[in-house]
Amino acid sequence: MYDIVIRVPENEPVTGQLGNGIYIVGSGADSHIQLDADGISPRHCQLTVEDGGIKVMDLGSNTGTYLDGERLGVGAKEVLPGDEIRIG
């Protein structure tokens, strides 16, 4: 299990845990992690959680997905402990 903290502007942070699996993050009703904020696409990014760690991949969002301040390109990137993912 991996601990996560989700911060949406003008809202209190939400904490949770992710087990192995694939999670879609976005504003759409079918997203596993649903966020209601400006600049978030219905299917914004994907988190893949495995025993070896977490990977993040942008799903063609309009405003991008960032890992420690760098906009993601094509493909998945490994997320290390303490890294920050920003969407929108």
Segments (PLM) and residue ranges:
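Forkhead-associated
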Residues: Y2-V8, E12-G88
